[in-house]
Amino acid sequence: MRLKLSLTPKQDFSFDKINKHTIQGFIYSLLKDTEFGEMHNQPRFKFWCFSDIFPPNDFVKGEDKYLLISSPREEFINVLYERLDNLEEVNLNNFKFEVSELKKFDLKVKNKFITGSPIVLYKDKDRGEYIKFYDDDFDLMFFVQRLQDNAVKKYKAFYNEEPVLNGFIFDRISPRVRNGRVDVYVRIAKKGREFLVVGTTWKLLEKIKIRKEERKFYKFIMDCGLGEKNSLGFGFINPIK
């Protein structure tokens, strides 16, 4: 299930003033004193994701920005909706926004997807090394296998069952090149420290045919997100026609 927020800034400021950690903290603040209130302290999959804020240009007073939040937990989305529905104004990094529109909705499973935020995968988690498209040793099959292994692991943790999946998670993938690059370096500020997270963006992630028994798995990844750090807003995907 998904939640779309239309946020109207009450002043002008630069786009980089709000980062992924800002949005994650905002979502956790909405969950306070709910059944999901202690989620941030739990060392396990969170099973939710959010998109990049769009359009990706500077904030202008009175001009709407949009944010999508998704989760396979319907109740999680319901809690956020109820909290936000009672608020006329929200703060993100001390910048005030009017909640001009709030919408809950579900999407049908399609066989093609596009990234709404970079997909993050570790090449070596112990060493903190991310898979980078432009590394000399980049291996597309290794990337797809890591993507699949991570998705299956999360699915099993959520449903306590094996997913039905025939073949690879995707049959065709095509990178999205922005400013001449596929790799996206995102600077995250947390507790006064900054660190870089490296992800990749894709204009096409396609499974040629999704069988009826596979739809549950693809609905899950569409709601949960792909790769690592989903609750930090990485790996958000949208279905395309």
Curated annotation (Swiss-Prot):
Key word DNA-binding present in the record? no
Cite the InterPro entries for this sequence. Cas_Cas6_C, CRISPR-assoc_prot_Cas6, CRISPR-assoc_prot_Cas6_N_sf
User: Per the UniProt record, which EC number(s) apply here?
Assistant: 3.1.-.-
Q: Sorted alphabetically, which keywords does the UniProt record give?
A: Antiviral defense, Endonuclease, Hydrolase, Nuclease, RNA-binding
Record-linked Pfam families: Cas_Cas6_C
**What residues correspond to the site Transition state stabilizer?**
K46
Tagged with keyword RNA-binding? yes
Q: Where does the record place the catalytic residues? A: Y28 (proton acceptor), H40 (proton donor)
Please, which domain of life does this record's source organism belong to? Archaea
One GO biological process term: defense response to virus
List the molecular function annotations (GO) for this entry: endonuclease activity; RNA binding
Q: What family does the database annotate? A: Belongs to the CRISPR-associated protein Cas6/Cse3/CasE family.
The task this protein performs is described as: CRISPR (clustered regularly interspaced short palindromic repeat) is an adaptive immune system that provides protection against mobile genetic elements (viruses, transposable elements and conjugative plasmids). CRISPR clusters contain sequences complementary to antecedent mobile elements and target invading nucleic acids. CRISPR clusters are transcribed and processed into CRISPR RNA (crRNA). This protein processes pre-crRNA into individual crRNA units.
Q: What is this protein called?
A: CRISPR-associated endoribonuclease Cas6 2
Its ancestry begins with: Archaea, Methanobacteriati, Methanobacteriota, Methanomada group, Methanococci
